[in-house]
Amino acid sequence: IPLSYGFEAWTGLEYTAATGMIYEGMSQEANDVITDVRNRYDGYKRNPFNEEECGNHYARAMASWSAIVALSGFHYSGVTHEFTITSAPGNYFWSNGHSWGNATVSSNKVTIVVHYGKLSVQTITLNNGKELKLKKMMTIAENNSSEFTIN
């Protein structure tokens, strides 16, 4: 008896497992899993824009976004206005539901760019424990940036 999608992997669960691996320090293994999923949907054997599980455009594959959050170490509290990001040098995407942008981390500097919306910050924390508490909350407006030195 042919079963629709009977031989398809559940990509959403693969992304979830990969994200867990990132949080456990297994970044290379996680990258291997994500690469395997993306290779499966290469446009030759499967549609690269439709990771089918239980029908077309099934939402569970959206779990892939959780890997971005895990790799960047991003967390934002709208209550305390704390912006947390990885201490690893690089350029990282962030999004908090009301605004989005990127943060560039280099040694002891963090530059936060807001591409859409506005972002209120009181504390900037790196995931290595270093943080900068501002004397007063500041708001970074859309299409603006602020650079912070964290010692």
Segments predicted by a language model, with ranges:
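Non-catalytic C-terminal accessory modules of carbohydrate-active enzymes
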Residues: 3, 7, 14-144
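Surface-exposed interaction regions enriched in Ser/Thr/Asp/Glu
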Residues: 146-151
